[in-house]
Amino acid sequence: LTGEAQAYYEREFAFFKKVTGISGSLRPYVKCSKPEKKAKIDEEMAKIAVEEGVYLPSNPDGAVVDIDRTSGRPLQSAAKTPFMATFKVRRAVAERTNPDDPPHVDVWQSAIFKVGDDCRQDMLALQVIAQFKNIFMAIGLDVYLDPYRVTATAPGCGVIDVVPNATSRDEMGRAKINDLSDFYKNRYGDEHSVAFQQARLNFIQSMAAYSVVCHILQIRDRHNGNIMFDGEGHVVHIDFGFLFDIGPGGMRFEPYSFKLSHEMVDVMGGHESPGFAMFEQLVVKAYLACRPFAHEIVATCGLMLGTDLPSFKGKATLDRLHERFKPNMTEREAALHAQWLVKDAYGNMRGTLYDLIQEKQNHIPYRR
């Protein structure tokens, strides 16, 4: 690169190096209170100048024109120091019906910045989640997945899109909302209202898809800080640092099936409700839908086999991944297996104990 191209490259990399570097500057504060971390983030954000043409690595389709310098927020992590910040992003308008309309639109976009985490694993998980989404869409199966963007910007550094208008179960607990059903009623109205029923449907459809994905990929660390609920009532799983053959602390303590707590089932209407029956039916359909694509999904994961990602334990990892599709089962046997997964997951004691451990160690609340 030479001339203006070289200058543009240097401006862009200098910009997100400074922003991402704030996460690194927080390391001495890892054991400090959130207000102390927040003050440090604000101090560092005030130093950052926005130069012309720079963009967020996870959103190259728009230019950053400003920063909300008081938006920095430290995020929950036992050993790392991720933080979230908000930027004003200017995007070109593709089609203007009126020539007097402005050629661009400004939107506020939040992103999470990490140092000390290998985001390649998140990128892999989300790439595979996008594969699952395409499979389900191709057959017209009404389930929901949100493969948001993650970009590894350097070894051990990355930028992660924030799910818009979403709240984690952890944040609900800290706001003294101790029941997931209460959250849905407070946000969408009475249980018999149209808005609540639509949110419940969105919840069920997304729970079914993520349940299958979490089982197939053996996604771990499913505490309440890693489960989000968007503005339409969908569940969205985030943070894929533990999958396949690893779990937090080197153990695989959580359920083999997936997380399905009592309060999640309560949002569906209860264990004996039509909502739960729909959930179980969608889990079976989603599981059967992805089985013919087992080789493609395994092949995508196999691209990372030669890396040093901790989730891979050699070819055996891929063999176990392929086995979870139950390739030797008939369609009926596979459907019964999916039903067994739902039965195993419901109120699984391992999931409850993991939530208890997270509450004791990291102060992440859950409903008892």
Residue ranges and their predicted role:
Residues L1-A209, N224, F229-R368:
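ATP-dependent kinase catalytic cores of phosphoinositide-metabolizing enzymes
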Residues Q218, H223-N224:
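Canonical protein kinase catalytic loop motif
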